Amino acid sequence: MVYSYTEKKRIRKDFGKRPQVLDVPYLLSIQLDSFQKFIEQDPDGQNGLEAAFRSVFPIQSYSGNAELQYVSYRLGEPVFDVKECQIRGVTYSAPLRVKLRLVIYEREAPEGTVKDIKEQEVYMGEIPLMTDNGTFVINGTERVIVSQLHRSPGVFFDSDKGKTHSSGKVLYNARIIPYRGSWLDFEFDPKDNLFVRIDRRRKLPATIILRAMNYSTEDILNLFFEKTTFEISNNKLMMTLVPERLRGETASFDIEANGKVYVEKGRRITARHIRQLEKEQIERIEVPVEYIAGKVVARDYIDEATGELICAANMEISLDVLARLSQAGHKTIETLFTNDLDHGAYISETIRVDPTNDRLSALVEIYRMMRPGEPPTREAAENLFENLFFSEDRYDLSAVGRMKFNRSLGREEVEGSGILSQEDIIEVMKKLIDIRNGKGEVDDIDHLGNRRIRSVGEMAENQFRVGLVRVERAVKERLSLGDLDALMPQDMINAKPISAAVKEFFGSSQLSQFMDQNNPLSEITHKRRISALGPGGLTRERAGFEVRDVHPTHYGRVCPIETPEGPNIGLINSLSVYAQTNEYGFLETPYRVVENNAVTDEIHYLSAIEEGNFIIAQANSVLDDDGHFVEELVTCRHKGESSLFSRDQVQYMDVSTQQVVSVGASLIPFLEHDDANRALMGANMQRQAVPTLRGDKPLVGTGMERAVAVDSGVTAVAKRGGTVQYVDASRIVIKVNEDETYAGEAGIDIYSLTKYTRSNQNTCINQTPCVSLGEPVERGDVLADGPSTDLGELALGQNMRVAFMPWNGYNYEDSILVSERVVQEDRFTTIHIQELACVSRDTKLGPEEITADIPNVGEAALSKLDESGIVYIGAEVKGGDILVGKVTPKGETQLTPEEKLLRAIFGEKASDVKDSSLRVPNGVSGTVIDVQVFTRDGVEKDKRALEIEESQLREVKKDLTEELRIFEAGLFARIRGVLIAGGIEADKLDKLPRERWLELGLADEEKQNQLEQLAEQYDELKAEFAKKLEAKRRKITQGDDLAPGVLKIVKVYLAVKRQIQPGDKMAGRHGNKGVISKINPIEDMPYDENGNPVDLVLNPLGVPSRMNIGQILETHLGMAAKGIGDKINAMLKQQQEVAKLREFIQKAYDLGMAPRQKVDLDTFSDEEVLRLAENLKKGMPTATPVFDGAEEMEIKEMLKLADLPTSGQITLFDGRTGEQFERPVTVGYMYMLKLNHLVDDKMHARSTGSYSLVTQQPLGGKAQFGGQRFGEMEVWALEAYGAAYTLQEMLTVKSDDVNGRTKMYKNIVDGNHQMEPGMPESFNVLLKEIRSLGINIELEDE
């Protein structure tokens, strides 16, 4: 296996046995690809902006003498880059410019004669852009648009499973769901009549819709029924016989022909009888006249002579009708063939309940149902019906919908019109009737073939189209308003509705969410999340059990483990590792093709529908070296069921053992040994881990760590290979390899690192270089670690030495006992950065002012502010300290203009102002690490703002100069090369200043050309530098675009260092969570024979009942990994020769049962081996992939290699007494996370504070600095105890007795601890409520 440069530094021992056929795909592609489709120019106009424009344009005026046509669009460059947008609090977006053509036709001339054409580029608002990491910056905060799983458009056949009607009868229904437009439902009622609903309104008989499409009763019966023909001859009634139709009936007369009786009266007709009748080709039999009575006529029968209607279609024949028909000379009579078994008379029955009888009455009925209360006219009724399903503006099935529709009806072609045709509606009705007749199955709504993914691009396109449609109406009116000659396209289009629609979607849609940025994993998971909620989706309350449940089709598409606990369980899912969406938006997953018993490396992506037809072997099936199945019978999946199949039947095989789970779950080692509920908690809690000060790679991982860290975008990754030319804390410079540069560039890549920035969750984002000067790097190598990464691997927590044993009740109820060493070594110390903002507004009494001159505030309080009234950087502040001094004018009187003028001239400033400074919230303390001042254009900047500006300019200048210096050095090196090749001596050159080199002439013409080219580049470089500097300077010095009425915003960033303490929540990766109960001195912790104390003591009772045994296996393997590291460390300390080291490390990598990983240390140089050993001495990291991990034997071998007991248990001694514990204890290394539920954020206690306005009771909650509620049950408790005085003070002075509490406070201050309870305010509220009901209550004074 080839390792990149960073990977060579620390290779993870892999226990996986199955070869990796397919690399893990780029994990954010679902977001990036979808948005790319939205903004890229699509020549076919199938998706994205192009499709939206083409669907709305051209817009014609009502008169038809002008139209506005769409030509093309382009996206401009964003004004600010991503970082600037985040700092300034603006949206990262690009202007959309659309080229439109206004065509004006001659009014009098023949049609289509063009009078004038005007083309113009029109601005149509801003389109938010996606950053490289799949997020959007909206108003300065990073947001993610979550993909939605919704019901695919198409037609669905379903039943109520007997739940609607009390009899338990199963009622079937069909629903046509378009992408946009009205829903059309057909449903049976308990009497077996077929009804139709439009948009879930009241139901109408289904035949109304057929009549509205101009079908007569006769046409309808022809469509839905087979006929039976009777002939009247010689006073006998003959019936045309189709033997198959008699199956299962009882003969009501002798069936005879040619004098032979085939079935006697009263006998049941069996298959044998039918075969006999078919064999002898009996086509007509005589039936008794009574047999026809009750049959239904298939068409109208008219008396030719008189023109009167004897019998209308769909009427029952009685014997006298038969006589009249015979008299009128009708010799053949067609009746409908129905039976109770498989040819129900549903449509015939429905026609009887249908009140309409022609097209107009049907249209009127539909109109009345859709628009009750409006008088129907013929035109309005016709328009309404046409627009419902047959108009492309109002109805669209979409390509997906048409494909699903045609598949559902068993048609061959996949493409077709986006609107419904009459045949479509009739075929749906026919299929529904077939299902009611027992032919065909209903659909499974939760099958992933019936649910599709709607990603960012598609939702943004829909929103954009909504905006365009709003504009369309306005344009139509403008086009009709006369003077077109003076108008340009620009005057027609108002960009406001478009940008409003887009802004609303990105800013406040339910699926546009504030990005979860706790750590890299939470970012990635959030972007791969799939929600069934949101507009056009389900609601939490309505979603039943079935929708939330795991479905067989989730396999390899949606993770069965990772979903939130609580009301959203099963509605919010995570995409599986290898899943992707196909062109229609259905999820598909990769499989290896199996041909002639051999598994090939060819890979097919199958959607849920396609997968149902194949037999698919599992990823852990045993194969021989040629890829043939070893066992005769293989465990396979077919049609959602798992069972054994012979190896010849297998058609596909899973790609990887990880393909079932999501990224979050694939990071849990030994997942296969954990109970599902705990695995769910484990996957969810990894997302809440706070990045620690120094990341520590997990000793026991799964091999997915690198993919997650790199794909998440928190690390700096080399775009091109080269050598490290310069590195410091904030930038890395790479001299690019010659073969990767393109002609005429300096070949330098500069990576600026993010330093101590605030994330959405107030955690700290900081990048640190992990390469050193002169190191070679390749494309894709990790150059710098971000938060929670270690050498380019995800590192959410720390490897802790744990012991499973009780310890004096301190691990009761999952509590955790922690050693003081953990605090001393800062293992779980985290940095949290808070942003506090102070806004100075223009009030109607005058502007608020930011100043250090605050009334009634002492010197001490102002000691940390500079002269502008803003806190210094580096100041340590605590709750209540002033960060930004601000005063607000409080005027009783509004000033007259004269007074304002006098004030302005004489500057009487000290008039009424009140202190409204920004203070540090209660319970927060920290260090000020950054201050930013934003000033409105035209407002004078204060001293501090100018200082900040200057320092920013200095930084930028320094950066750009450094960049220029590096580029220059690169260029001059090439110039020197050309000059020396041209025959100039090196030492002469070096005596000349570099600028003079360019003036030298060379004899060789080709070399001279090269030199001139390089000189040109040098000039370009300098010009570019000047341009860049000027642009940056302009950006920094220009005023900021602030909200209306805001003059200044000052943002202060506080960094808080949080050490671990009792009350913090910690967890492992297996759902084993707990709260720290005590931090114990090192000397009191249990220790082993060598005197090494453990770091954490966990409760062994937390394991058996929860069935997450993965944590125990992880502990054992962690112990072995650490033991091997210790041995390597000892060898390094003894300075043994490299050969021995190489041999030992090689032995460790080769250990285990046929691992897929082949590490060949012979290809490593001694230097590389030493560096590897240096990185392994703290423990050899291992990978046990999900469902393909280390086995018990392998863990034992590892323990043996590390010279540790294979039981994984060791003897411990009590740190307090030095006595040995009575039995060996499981000790090992477990990866523990500190979760973002810190006691500092939760703990609070109220002394005095704010009160509710009406009831005058204290508020509740930490944010309001509220008290603890003493509710009615608590009152009962005090009553039960008879604690009268306690109860009295709870209900009065401690709550809402306003006078009593003020007096009480005074008394306590005076040292007098007495209370005089008065009237609680809530009693007055009660009185007022009773009086408002018109009952007067008066309180009598005693």
Swiss-Prot record:
Keywords: DNA-directed RNA polymerase, Nucleotidyltransferase, Transcription, Transferase. SUPFAM superfamilies: beta and beta-prime subunits of DNA dependent RNA-polymerase (SSF64484). It catalyses: RNA(n) + a ribonucleoside 5'-triphosphate = RNA(n+1) + diphosphate. DNA-dependent RNA polymerase catalyzes the transcription of DNA into RNA using the four ribonucleoside triphosphates as substrates. This is DNA-directed RNA polymerase subunit beta. Its EC number is 2.7.7.6. GO terms for molecular function: DNA binding; DNA-directed RNA polymerase activity; ribonucleoside binding. Coiled coil: none annotated. Belongs to the RNA polymerase beta chain family. Disulfide bonds: none annotated. GO terms for cellular component: DNA-directed RNA polymerase complex. The keyword Ribosomal protein does not apply. One of its GO terms (biological process) is DNA-templated transcription. It comes from the Bacteria. PROSITE patterns: RNA_POL_BETA (PS01166). It comes from Proteus mirabilis (strain HI4320). The RNAP catalytic core consists of 2 alpha, 1 beta, 1 beta' and 1 omega subunit. When a sigma factor is associated with the core the holoenzyme is formed, which can initiate transcription.
